[in-house]
């Protein structure tokens, strides 16, 4: 096992270093072509050669701008982070395969904690200008990426892992990983690809709606990461083990259970993101040049994107069910089809909503619609692959959770309106209350209604909560 892991890691290092080298070369040439005397003051011959190759008109064209030049320099500095994050992901997969989930999950906390420390403490002391502080943050990204990977090494060491070079060339394990990795990446990156395509289309209409939509995507990624991706990460090795032993009844039961937990968490999260979109955006972003108009635009984008939360998360779960069965091509094909549908939906809806000045809403709905088709096609293909899915018991629970989420969402919306009517939202504490108080009450009502309806997921949550309370009392 460890020899195969070492071969994969060695291949990853070779590939990442090759890509990093090419990017370094490309960025250096771009910067040198625009300012050969500045970049090669010690080599005037190189500057003259570059001028002969590119021509003086290109060198004096004014491209790239100062902002683009800063971006290129930061990219050149930060691009080695790609190697760090790839190693961290490989280490996480190795630990997951050995049944360890907490340590790799905390790796992201290590990364974000170091970035926050860099912004708050290191960057202000690095220089007074914004460029110097941005440079400090770029260095912090590299350090945090290395720490995220190194943080997981002690756990791997205890499992018996020791790295040594194993040539990846003509290695059968590396060949299989590469063969399955490319379609696998396209399969699980459906949400990111759809967002990228939608933003590219929206730029041709109005660049401001792209900024509004980007804020909505960032807010969506929090519950999607907490509930969807974390559950999918845990699920893959479990399903893979059941598939390897050909325990397909247990495979279907585990998948059904995971989808039930996903619906339990994501339906209420979707409802709250929809009805509390404006208070949430106001609390997090409304300050400085981000005014009330900006809040309304971003909130509308979030409200249109929020119904797709459970769909985006379900794509991650279902795609990993295929991967556990050794099939990486089907999710890739379905993702490609839905990417094409997303382009059609985006062109149609962005232009339609842009006539009312709300093109960001069209972006959200387009992504939600393509995700719905993605989930439906994945379910259809998986049912054919497994003969049946045994989801009959989940349907009753799903509609009960959907009804409870709608009820809780309506009450949260009314509660937020009443709170703002009495408390306003000019200061931080009223803004915080307009989000947290309705959210807490809605979650409580949602859970109590599902307990009353005897939904299994709510009952299991109650049992888990009681066990934790008993442990604390002891």
Residue ranges of model-derived segments:
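Membrane-embedded alpha-helical bundles of multi-pass transporters/translocases
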Residues: 1-474
């Amino acid at each position: 096992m460890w020899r195969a892991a070492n071969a994969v890691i060695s291949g990853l290092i070779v590939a990442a270093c090759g890509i990093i080298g090419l990017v370094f070369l490309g960025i250096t040439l771009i910067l040198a072509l625009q300012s050969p005397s500045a970049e090669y003051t010690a080599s005037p011959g190189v500057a003259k050669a570059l001028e002969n190759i590119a021509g003086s008109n290109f060198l004096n064209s004014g491209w790239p701008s100062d902002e683009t030049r800063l971006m290129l320099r930061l990219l050149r500095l930060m691009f080695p982070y790609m190697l760090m994050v790839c190693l961290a992901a490989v280490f996480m997969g190795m630990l997951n395969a050995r049944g360890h989930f907490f340590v790799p999950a905390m790796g992201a906390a290590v990364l974000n904690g170091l970035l926050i420390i860099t912004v708050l403490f290191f960057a202000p002391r690095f220089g007074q200008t914004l460029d110097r502080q941005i440079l400090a943050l770029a260095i912090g990204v590299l350090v945090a990426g290395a720490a995220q990977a190194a943080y997981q090494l002690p756990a791997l060491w205890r499992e018996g892992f020791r790295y040594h070079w194993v040539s990846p060339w003509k290695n059968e394990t590396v060949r299989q990983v590469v063969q399955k990795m490319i379609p696998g990446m396209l399969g699980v990156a459906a949400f990111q690809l759809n967002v990228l395509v939608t933003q590219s289309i929206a730029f041709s209409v109005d660049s401001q709606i792209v900024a509004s939509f980007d804020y909505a995507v960032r807010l969506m990624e929090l519950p999607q990461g907490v509930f969807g991706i974390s559950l999918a990460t845990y699920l893959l090795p479990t399903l893979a083990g059941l598939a390897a032993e050909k325990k397909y009844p247990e495979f279907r039961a585990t998948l059904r259970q995971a989808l039930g937990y996903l619906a339990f968490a994501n339906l209420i999260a979707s409802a709250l993101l929809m009805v509390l979109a404006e208070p949430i955006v106001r609390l997090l972003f409304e300050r400085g040049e981000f005014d009330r108009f900006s809040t309304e635009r971003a909130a509308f984008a979030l409200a249109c994107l929020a119904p797709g939360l459970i769909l985006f998360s379900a794509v991650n779960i279902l795609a990993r069910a295929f991967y556990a069965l050794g099939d990486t091509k089907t999710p890739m094909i379905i993702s490609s089809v839905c990417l094409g549908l997303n382009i059609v939906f985006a062109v149609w809806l962005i232009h339609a909503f842009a006539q009312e000045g709300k093109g960001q809403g069209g972006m959200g709905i387009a992504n939600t619609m393509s995700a719905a088709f993605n989930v439906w096609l994945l379910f259809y293909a998986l049912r054919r692959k497994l003969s049946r899915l045994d989801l009959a018991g989940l349907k009753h629970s799903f509609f009960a959770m959907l009804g409870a989420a709608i009820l809780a969402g309506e009450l949260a919306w009314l509660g937020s309106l009443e709170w703002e009517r009495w408390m306003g939202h000019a200061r931080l504490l009223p803004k915080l209350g307009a989000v947290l108080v309705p959210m807490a009450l809605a979650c409580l009502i949602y859970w109590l209604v599902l307990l009353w309806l005897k939904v299994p997921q709510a009952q299991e949550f109650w049992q888990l909560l009681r066990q934790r309370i008993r442990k604390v009392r002891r």
